[in-house]
Amino acid sequence: MGKQFASIEPYHREFIERQRIFFNASACAEGRVNLSPRDVASLRVVGPNAVFYLDLTGSGNETAAHLLADGRLTLMCCAFEGPPMILRLYGKGRVIAWRSQEYDRLLAEHFGAKETPGARQMIWLDVDGVQTSCGMNVPLFDYSGERDQLIRWAEKQGEAGLEEYRSKKNRQSIDGFPTPFAEEFAP
């Protein structure tokens, strides 16, 4: 039932863009495996072998730590409505630092230079494999809307509050692996 591809085909891109949520999975050789849900509105397919997403401030920063240590990253979309399908993007990921030249360029090119409140970095994936599978066991869900709590929280924090939060909560993974913020907020 599963099929493998060397790159993202046009119909894969269309499938990704129709979804409401995607999941990212990362790990190091040691420690826990991380799996996180993300809003597809933050994800951009920029070529047959490249995607990235705008990553918002959260209670942890596992993906960034894992990418620094190992680089492996998998993104997955599932059809929760319409015809069943699961699509996985495999490859090597990297962190694009907040407010770096590359970050600013990608923000301008793919988000109209409009930054979501709480944005902390971008996660880039060089795709070296695509897999689709049937998804016939994935349940159907009715979409009822986006949550706005994180954006409202970030707006309330302001830049200084977000920086303080990241310095406390986003410097290392739960297994103690450093993130890009470890150097930025070094004591």
Named regions from a protein language model:
Residues 1-187:
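Binding-site signature for planar aromatic cofactors or substrates
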